[in-house]
Amino acid sequence: DCDVICMAVGLTPTTELFWQAGAKMQYCPQLCGHVPFRDNTMRTSHPDIWVAGDASGIEEASAAMVEGRIAGFSAAKALGCKVKEESFKEYWTRLDHLRAGEVGEKIRGGICQVLVDGWEA
């Protein structure tokens, strides 16, 4: 079951739903605005909300699509679906390649500010 999927495109993260849900947020200029803290599965501090794409910070569309896969796999796993752990590793490797080099330096710096090791239950 899913109550809401929010999609947005732009140059500023659209994060009002995260604010309203009480997710922990951080202003991060490298990611072009306020974005939610998230773990490596793209889950926010709200246990039922994941973030991906422009809502997690403005970067390339290809990175947004990969983040969407990670968030989707994570949400499916949280609902009890079987998800291969290799899927997470494969998509994180893709993200690392997309964010590599000098071009991705700014994005990597921003992500370091909002990525957490995990959420306490």
What feature does the model see in each segment?
Residues 1-121:
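Residues forming the flavin
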